[in-house]
């Protein structure tokens, strides 16, 4: 079973913002170069004012909570759930088995900033906790198949139905991982089907993910 967090609001601070006072302040605080910082709206709100699509950027906290939620599930701990996430530049990363995502948000930010630069953590040889899987969503689809998309404009259904579809087809379940706005058209085109739950109400990423994982557990896991 596979879940992929799509279009995550995760990226390093763009070069155009390196000289902004808020970015420089953050860099001095953490003792690193501006280009090694993760873009974060809570720290760089004013700096982000002129960024294109700023409403979909600078929210790594959403991915943090989503990963904490999914990696804390029996399904993941039994080795039955594979987790992927797509960052802002389009790359997709795979979370290894048995990974303990840092509960401390600042530690998580540092880990993801390193990941975006080295494409695996820890860097070097040995087993990676998180590693690059695909350089684009198109490549991901080639390797893993088209995905079942959770989308508030999709066909209304239940999480049980979505979980059953994923189990019968072997396709990943895609969940948006950004604060507001729409999926890119290129993302929508790569979905095999799209469904909404809870009457199409807008739900938080981790809310959707937790409901889907629980539905998968009820259908698949012997311990639920």
UniProtKB/Swiss-Prot annotation:
Q: Where is this site: Stabilizes Arg-59?
A: 61
Q: Keywords in UniProt for this one? A: Methyltransferase, Ribosome biogenesis, RNA-binding, rRNA processing, rRNA-binding, S-adenosyl-L-methionine, Transferase
Q: Which EC number(s) are documented for this chain?
A: 2.1.1.-
A Pfam family per the record: EMG1
What's a single GO MF annotation on this record? Answer: rRNA (pseudouridine) methyltransferase activity
Class of enzymatic activity (EC top level): transferase
Record: residues binding S-adenosyl-L-methionine: 176, 181, 198-203
Instruction: Name any Gene Ontology BP term.
Output: rRNA base methylation
Site (Interaction with substrate rRNA) at: 59, 100, 103, 107
Substrates-to-products reaction catalysed: a pseudouridine in rRNA + S-adenosyl-L-methionine = an N(1)-methylpseudouridine in rRNA + S-adenosyl-L-homocysteine + H(+)
The job of this chain, per UniProt, is described as: Methyltransferase involved in ribosomal biogenesis. Specifically catalyzes the N1-methylation of the pseudouridine corresponding to position 914 in M.jannaschii 16S rRNA.
Q: How does it assemble?
A: Homodimer.
Q: Which PANTHER family match?
A: NEP1/MRA1, RIBOSOMAL RNA SMALL SUBUNIT METHYLTRANSFERASE NEP1
Q: Return the similarity comment.
A: Belongs to the class IV-like SAM-binding methyltransferase superfamily. RNA methyltransferase NEP1 family.
Its name, as the record gives it, is Ribosomal RNA small subunit methyltransferase Nep1
Q: Which organism is it from?
A: Aeropyrum pernix (strain ATCC 700893 / DSM 11879 / JCM 9820 / NBRC 100138 / K1)
Q: Which gene encodes it?
A: nep1
């Amino acid at each position: 079973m596979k879940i992929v967090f799509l279009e995550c609001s995760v990226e390093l601070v763009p070069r155009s913002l390196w000289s902004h006072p808020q970015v420089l302040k953050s860099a001095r605080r953490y003792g690193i170069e501006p280009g090694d910082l993760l873009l974060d709206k809570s720290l760089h709100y004013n700096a982000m004012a002129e960024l294109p699509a700023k409403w979909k950027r600078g929210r790594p906290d959403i991915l943090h909570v989503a990963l904490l939620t999914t990696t804390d599930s029996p399904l993941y701990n039994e080795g039955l759930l594979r987790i992927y996430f797509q960052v802002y530049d389009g790359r997709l990363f795979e979370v290894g088995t048995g990974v303990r995502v840092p509960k401390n948000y600042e530690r998580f930010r540092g880990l993801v900033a390193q990941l975006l630069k080295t494409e695996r953590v820890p860097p070097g040889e040995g087993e990676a906790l998180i590693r690059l899987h695909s350089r684009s969503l198109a490549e991901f689809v080639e390797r893993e198949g088209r995905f079942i998309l959770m989308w508030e404009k999709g066909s209304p259904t239940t999480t049980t139905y979505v979980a059953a579809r994923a189990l019968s087809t072997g396709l990943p379940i895609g969940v948006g991982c950004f604060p507001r706005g729409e999926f890119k058209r290129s993302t929508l085109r790569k979905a095999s089907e799209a469904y909404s739950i809870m009457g199409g109400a807008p739900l938080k990423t981790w809310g959707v993910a937790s409901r889907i994982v629980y539905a998968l557990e009820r259908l698949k896991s012997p311990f639920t």
